[in-house]
Amino acid sequence: MKLKKTIGAMALATLFATMGASAVEKTISVTASVDPTVDLLQSDGSALPNSVALTYSPAVNNFEAHTINTVVHTNDSDKGVVVKLSADPVLSNVLNPTLQIPVSVNFAGKPLSTTGITIDSNDLNFASSGVNKVSSTQKLSIHADATRVTGGALTAGQYQGLVSIILTKST
């Protein structure tokens, strides 16, 4: 009887030792930006993309607008939101940063600037999505205007820039 227990214990110890030798550990860094009062998400509930690629069309000598369907999530659907840009966005040529293309941003059909605009809660149509504190779909549109290049003529190359949107609850 003792021999059976000893052999069983040895078999289990060997099994666990083998499993431990083939294990691998993975670490995933997780980040979050939290504002418990208001957020701007894609209409499917996912975060806004970290980057978008604007498409230049030689046929029209300009960029196509990039549109993202968004929704406002809030903890107080009686209040609207104030939306603004932290800086005027431009696309700068990577090799010649003085060559810049102005970028326009529209939210809910209104042009954004560094001065905040207020969008009333009635215009956001909270609860129309079926969720009390989620707005109806609002379009966020980003467009670079190749007809207004500064620093020289538009040339082939890589251009990059930032669009930083600040969204706060109105008072």
Swiss-Prot record:
<comment type="function">
    <text>Fimbriae (also called pili), polar filaments radiating from the surface of the bacterium to a length of 0.5-1.5 micrometers and numbering 100-300 per cell, enable bacteria to colonize the epithelium of specific host organs.</text>
</comment>
<protein>
    <recommendedName>
        <fullName>CS1 fimbrial subunit A</fullName>
    </recommendedName>
</protein>
<feature type="signal peptide">
    <location>
        <begin position="1"/>
        <end position="23"/>
    </location>
</feature>
<dbReference type="Pfam" id="PF04449">
    <property type="entry name" value="Fimbrial_CS1"/>
</dbReference>
<dbReference type="InterPro" id="IPR007540">
    <property type="entry name" value="Fimbrial_CS1-type"/>
</dbReference>
<comment type="similarity">
    <text>Belongs to the fimbrial CS1 protein family.</text>
</comment>
<keyword id="KW-0614">Plasmid</keyword>
<dbReference type="GO" id="GO:0009289">
    <property type="term" value="C:pilus"/>
</dbReference>
<keyword id="KW-0732">Signal</keyword>
<keyword id="KW-0281">Fimbrium</keyword>
